[in-house]
Amino acid sequence: LNEVRASGKYKLYDGNYEDILTYKAEYNCESMLESNRIFDASNSMDEFSFFEVMNHWRTDKLDMSGSNNQFNGTGWGFMVPQKKLYDAFVQEEGVDGYRLNQTMKTYDQISQLGVKVAKGQSLINEGYFMWKRRFSNVESPAGFWCSYNNYRWMRYAEVLLLAAEANLKDGNQSEAD
C-alpha cells in the first residue's frame, strides 16, 4: 500500500464529489480498478445489471414527473442511508456540509428537485436518499435495467485508508498520518 501511495500514479478526485461514482467521472485520477462498460445502441441489453436497480430509489412509490425526467424510473430502493449516518455527517460538518450534500439528500432536498412520494404511496425508509450513486436517464439510454456507467472496484481513497490503518497497526505513526 505504501508503494502505491509513493508511486504518484493516483490522486484523490478533484471534481464534484457527487459525480465520483457516475458516468461523468469514469477513469478519473482516483480510479484504480474499473470495469469498462461501453454504450452500444445496437446492443444495449449487453449492459443489463441489477446493480443500478438495487441501489436506485424506490421509484414505484415516487412521483418523478417534476424532475425534468433526469432520473431513471426503475429502482427498488435498497442501500438507503439511515438517519444515524446523516446525523454523523451533520455532527462532523453541519447540515450544509459539502460531503453530506454530495453523498445523500433528504426528502425535502429531492422534493425541491421534483421528486416526491406519489399520492397514496409510502416509502419504508428514514427520509434519506443516496445521491452519490444515483441512476440518471443519461446513463441509461435504453431504459429499464441497462447502464453504461463503469463500476469502480478500487479507488485511491480506499488505498489511503487501508494504508493508514495498516501503518497504525504496525506502529508506524508517521506513515499512518
Go through the PLM ranges and name each one:
Residues 1-119:
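An aromatic- and glycine-enriched ligand-binding surface/loop that stacks and positions planar moieties
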Residues 6, 25, 41, 88, ...:
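A sequence-composition feature that detects small, non-aromatic residues
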Residues 62, 136-138, 159:
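General helical structural elements
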Residues 114-155:
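Active-site beta-strand/loop architecture of penicillin-binding DD-peptidases
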